[in-house]
Amino acid sequence: MRKIKIITDSTAGLTLEEAAKWNIDVLYLTVEIDGKVYNPKTDITPEEFMVRMAETKELPKSSQPAIGSFVEAYEKYTAEGYEILSIHLTEKLSGTVNAARQAADMVEGNITVVDCDYTARGQAFQVLKAAEMAQSGDYSVEEIHAKINDIRDKTKLYIVVVTLDNLIKGGRVGRMQGFLGSLLNIKLIAKLTDGQLEEETKVRSNKKVLQYCLNLIKDEPKKIQHLDVVHANGLNLADDFIAESKEITGLTEIPLFFADPVISTHAGTGAFAFMYYTD
């Protein structure tokens, strides 16, 4: 029976139950608020982070896991006879996967590092399938890698930014443009494409946000296998979207998750995202 260990990072948004059930190791990105560094695993909950973020004038900073954390994990599991499949968020948003690659070069053993091209539950889709296949003992690393690449190619991820405050703080939107956007109640809908966030459209009310997002689901030509929703204090939109999407897709379950602090930093208060993969 093959011994394959799946490792990922915290931006995948796995629950503690999922990580335990599938024996997945999670390395945590940290966040810094007003000079103090927090580890989301031990120091701050996603809900607490939203409160702290609202209170600070500066945009919180996120930091990838140290290379030493990857080296430690890789050495531990290779010494126990495991092959390793290490799956991480797109390098367009973080240097995490590059840190993993550098660590893999420093450790002897069969270590495969994957840039999944996504983050949040779009990343989790690949991680959970990889862990399920690894736990069965019936598949090689190459077979698992091929399967998660297939899921990646069939995944779509959209994010709705309802306030431009964090984009202004982060310098992604000019202050005047941000002021006008807030004045006009503009909501930004973006799509993650090839690991890069790109503007999909702008709308001017929550009603139009919901309508646009539901139309994306309605117009999907292939059958949606799995649909997850993530929010950063954006429950109103997320709940309405889930209720309507169940009717459209026939899915009986559409899980809802609170966003990881790193995701919330970029998306801001009130944001929600949905991601799915198809046949």
From Swiss-Prot:
GO terms for molecular function: lipid binding. Gene3D superfamilies: 3.30.1180.10, 3.40.50.10170. Residues 4-278 form the DegV domain. Transmembrane segments: none annotated. Keywords: Lipid-binding. Coiled coil: none annotated. The keyword Cell inner membrane does not apply. SUPFAM superfamilies: DAK1/DegV-like. Signal peptide: none annotated. Pfam families: DegV. InterPro entries: DegV, DegV_C, DegV_domain_contain. It comes from the Bacteria. Hexadecanoate binds at S62, S94. Disulfide bonds: none annotated. The keyword Ribonucleoprotein does not apply. NCBIfam families: DegV. May bind long-chain fatty acids, such as palmitate, and may play a role in lipid transport or fatty acid metabolism. This is DegV domain-containing protein lmo1863.
